[in-house]
């Protein structure tokens, strides 16, 4: 697992936490760590093998907890916090935010209130006229979402 993949996992973790409405300061700490990891010149795997936790903590934004998660990620390909979070909020919910008009709050509403947790679920929801029931989605946003799902002709 390279630095970019590790950074991507922390960006995803922060996004899932944002969807759940977790503490904004915690989200920011994961995003800051991800930004630093993404551009760090030395592979984190190398640092972890040679210097352990202390070496990883030398990276700006990486404290003891995040360094521990990096080591877990390198050893197992995942970490406990990720497993726990994705058990409650599937990773596929992140795909919803790739669509125009759907940010973290709307993704959270779709998932929590309407049990939409993937693009497939959203297509069925939209085809059944579900967007009109979602607070915060007006006609223009609904149209953007339909167009991006290629459902505007239905």
What role is predicted for each listed range?
Residues 1-22:
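Charged, compositionally biased N-terminal leader segments and the immediate start
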Residues 33-154:
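Accessory alpha-helical DNA-binding modules that contact the DNA backbone or grooves
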């Amino acid at each position: 697992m390279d630095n970019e993949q590790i950074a991507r996992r922390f960006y995803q973790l922060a996004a899932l936490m944002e969807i759940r409405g977790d503490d904004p300061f915690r989200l920011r700490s994961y995003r800051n760590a991800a930004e630093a990891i993404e551009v760090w010149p030395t592979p984190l795997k190398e640092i972890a093998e040679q210097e352990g936790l202390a070496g990883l903590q030398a990276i700006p934004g990486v404290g003891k907890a995040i360094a521990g998660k990096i080591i877990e990620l390198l050893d197992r390909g995942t970490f406990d916090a990720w497993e726990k979070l994705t058990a409650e909020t599937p990773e596929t919910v992140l795909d919803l935010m790739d669509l125009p008009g759907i940010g973290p709050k709307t993704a959270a509403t779709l998932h929590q209130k309407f049990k939409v947790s993937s693009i497939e679920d959203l297509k069925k929801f939209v085809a059944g006229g579900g967007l009109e029931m979602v607070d915060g989605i007006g006609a223009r946003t609904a149209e953007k979402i339909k167009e991006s799902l290629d459902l505007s002709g239905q």
